[in-house]
Amino acid sequence: MQLLLLIPLHYRLKDSKRIYQIILNLGSLLRISSIRQDNMELLELIIDPMIKAEVIERVSEFLTKTLGKIIVKCNDTSGFIANRVGYFLLELVARKAISQNLDVATIDKIFTTFLGLPSTGIFGLYDLIGYDVMKLISSSLLASLPANDAYHKIICKDPCS
């Protein structure tokens, strides 16, 4: 699944003033350079409750009718959905496959053929994203997710252990 992000964010200043913005990020944190933005069908929409409904409607209409995107409404929670779901899947499958000594090519074939992952498969995608980026995403998720989040159960702090 390829995601395009639309993220309305609000910031609280020290003097309690709020600034509300809608930021269009026509890319993805997990963006792969060979994927063009017009190929990304889904668009993640996180709405601050203080943003007026008519603003959301106008932006949504533009994104769906003009850009042809499918909007996925998400709660404002730690980690973008692409990272929360995608990274969890990559880590879980990679760790299970390695711990159970499963064939990497077979795992990649299963996920591309039956589950519609990109042709890179799990391990190819992990490699394409890069260990350094995967580690940054992991650190961010570990720091921001509650202790009872399922992510904490699949990740080990030291990738070599």
From Swiss-Prot:
| Molecular function in Gene Ontology | oxidoreductase activity, acting on the CH-OH group of donors, NAD or NADP as acceptor
Share an example GO biological-process annotation for this protein: fatty acid metabolic process
Per its UniProt entry, which superkingdom is the organism in? Answer: Bacteria
Tell me the InterPro entries matching this sequence. 3HC_DH_C (IPR006108), 6-PGluconate_DH-like_C_sf (IPR008927)
Alphabetical list of PANTHER family matching this protein = 3-HYDROXYACYL-COA DEHYDROGENASE FAMILY PROTEIN, 3-HYDROXYACYL-COA DEHYDROGENASE-RELATED
This protein's name: Putative uncharacterized protein RC0841
